[in-house]
Amino acid sequence: MNILPKSIPIRIQSLRRYQGSLKTSLRALSTRPIFEKRLLAETPFSIRPSNASVLIAKRSPKFGWKQVRFYAANPNGGNFRMDLGGGRKQGAALEEYGTDLTALAKQGKLDPVIGREEEIQRTIQILSRRTKNNPALVGPAGVGKTAIMEGLASRIIRGEVPESMKDKRVIVLDLGALISGAKFRGDFEERLKSVLSDLEGAEGKVILFVDEMHLLLGFGKAEGSIDASNLLKPALARGKLHCCGATTLEEYRKYIEKDAALARRFQAVMVNEPSVADTISILRGLKERYEVHHGVRITDDALVTAATYSARYITDRFLPDKAIDLVDEACSSLRLQQESKPDELRRLDRQIMTIQIELESLRKETDTTSVERREKLESKLTDLKEEQDKLSAAWEEERKLLDSIKKAKTELEQARIELERTQREGNYARASELQYAIIPELERSVPKEEKTLEEKKPSMVHDSVTSDDIAVVVSRATGIPTTNLMRGERDKLLNMEQTIGKKIIGQDEALKAIADAVRLSRAGLQNTNRPLASFLFLGPTGVGKTALTKALAEFLFDTDKAMIRFDMSEFQEKHTIARLIGSPPGYIGYEESGELTEAVRRKPYAVLLFDELEKAHHDITNLLLQVLDEGFLTDSQGRKVDFRSTLIVMTSNLGSDILVADPSTTVTPKSRDAVMDVVQKYYPPEFLNRIDDQIVFNKLSEKNLEDIVNVRLDEVQQRLNDRRIILTVTEAARKWLAEKGYSPAYGARPLNRLIQKRILNTMAMKIIQGEIKSDENVVIDVLDGELEFKANKLEPQSTSHED
């Protein structure tokens, strides 16, 4: 029964309210029984209830149970630092932050290491020292520094090491795991300290390998506390820690040599790039692993091509890594082709689907035409399905053979790994069975199935990686044509002079020199240590020096925009050289790459044009000396840029006054000698001596100009095609243009201006006024010494023909 008046609850709600929490001491008392029970249950040593009260008072209210540190009485005396939930056992840090290479070697998961005998032996010698037994593998990225430690782990497993190195473990430190989650100051140092403690506790039985060691040594500096290098120094000096690091020469100089105390604790082992021959041996050793992984065959020609092409065309990386990447990518490309439907089957599927859709639309039609059409489609559909079934069966059969070969190779590899393991474990009964029964049977079955596949001559599936596949990968990555010449390309190269000669009139000598250089390159006979070719084009203005270079780029790449052009009038000052290779350190723009070096790095197969070279500063020629002779140029960042796949053209107007004064339209020996005298006085001999050919262009004759008129009018017609306007120029008008546009001193440029002024400007006005419309034929003739324009409506067949 409610005895309170109804007004009291309303009154209470109107009063001021206070909210808050219990005091810390009260909250501690309320949680005390729970905490005492948990603490006594999880502490790995005996603790008195009286101490539990002290522990509760010492805990920080800011953190949860896992982050709170407690101090309890150690039964042996003194204080013992502990984490709630139990202490860390010996070696736990190495398990958490490391990967055991020797365990992976036992399982056969490491690739075989070919060569590197000297580097591995040197590493073992340093590890066997009493103090400062810490090798540092120093070398460029991709030369195989990590592989040396994998080779050491494999040798330890096989027992191919000195007695003092047997039964040791090689553990790779995982820097990502070591850093991740270290949110609070001191967390990283504590983790590293636990790793070092585990290593010292292993008593020399563990070799710690730190890949990218310069990253580890720099950690901790940002927090202002003791960094990793200072934690490592005492252990490294005492010899209690077997640590092997790997880094590049640049990072070694930047992070380790700068600290003399740290540098003297490591012994550098230089790991140089292997030769092409050594790389081929490495690829042959890895061949079986990649065949098993991808399920394809790799020919020996493909391995040789991968090593030679990677050394020749991929210059910004190092062997053997870049060669292995070529083989791996070629294998993956072939594997995708095998797992996808062949093009013939996909084409049949599309045809069948199209017919089925059409049949569905004709299903309810009853007229005679529709019925006949339906019968024809049904007959065609039956034939296509029969062909589809036949091809599908052949494809499935070929795929089954390939899968069978892949399965046999996988079983053979697993059997060999098991044989090594059983021999180590002393299980000689199983080892005997593997060595004399299982492995020989598998070794016989693999060639047998491969022979069966070859006899069937598979047409649907390509089963082998060849040198052509490697060449395709190189071409795709660099843009450099390395594939074998196809029939159409052969004909194109053989007729190169005639093709370019349709646009460049009257310069047969220059065309021949350019065509010979390109053919030499595509045949693979050019000097591999120089650019494809280098030319100096000399002659008066307007004779086609720049136009020939544009036509060459269009011939090679189907667009004249593939040419990299530098107008040398922009480089008249000495400081503008920095624009080509990048600014030196300390100057504005140092981080930006040079215009020349960056363009060639991005497009190594290109036509380089240095237009009007004589207008540039003389130091530009000194810069080009190395490019013309060695095919390399070093930019401001220290990167070597490869120019060996470029074709370099330099144009100049030096001596043009001599050629203009000569009445002959072709270059006479006397004129040539006079021009070359001027050139030799202007450029140093070491520059001219490095150029492959110096070509003097002919003056344009009146007959040449008539041919150029036809070329220019064809270009005008290309612009009018979009408007469906046909341009018809009479023979009289063509001769009028050639006469009015001829100038021995200025070449073809006056003709271009004449066509612009007398034809294009007039037609533009008439189009805007509506006098010339689409689908009309514009006839240009000469009347009273001037050009006359007449527009006639096109016949329908003419319009369709032009379209």
Swiss-Prot record:
Belongs to the ClpA/ClpB family. Homohexamer, forming a ring with a central pore. The keyword Nucleotide-binding applies. One of its GO terms (molecular function) is ATP hydrolysis activity. GO terms for biological process: cellular response to heat; protein refolding; protein unfolding. Residues 465-656 are annotated as: NBD2. One of its GO terms (cellular component) is mitochondrial matrix. It is found in: Mitochondrion matrix. Has 2 AAA ATPase type nucleotide-binding domains (NBDs) per monomer. NBD1 is primarily responsible for ATP hydrolysis. NBD2 is crucial for oligomerization. Keywords: ATP-binding, Chaperone, Coiled coil, Mitochondrion, Nucleotide-binding, Repeat, Stress response, Transit peptide. This is Heat shock protein 78, mitochondrial. The lineage of its organism: Eukaryota, Fungi, Dikarya, Ascomycota, Taphrinomycotina. Gene3D superfamilies: 1.10.8.60, P-loop containing nucleotide triphosphate hydrolases. SUPFAM superfamilies: P-loop containing nucleoside triphosphate hydrolases (SSF52540). Its main location: mitochondrion. Required, in concert with mitochondrial Hsp70, for the dissociation, resolubilization and refolding of aggregates of damaged proteins in the mitochondrial matrix after heat stress. May extract proteins from aggregates by unfolding and threading them in an ATP-dependent process through the axial channel of the protein hexamer, after which they can be refolded by the Hsp70 chaperone system. Required for resumption of mitochondrial respiratory function, DNA synthesis and morphology after heat stress. Residues 343-431 form a coiled coil. PROSITE patterns: CLPAB_1, CLPAB_2. Pfam families: AAA (PF00004), AAA_2 (PF07724), AAA_lid_9 (PF17871), ClpB_D2-small (PF10431). ATP binds at residues 139-146, 539-546. Residues 1-36 form a transit peptide. The keyword Coiled coil applies. Residues 94-342 are annotated as: NBD1.
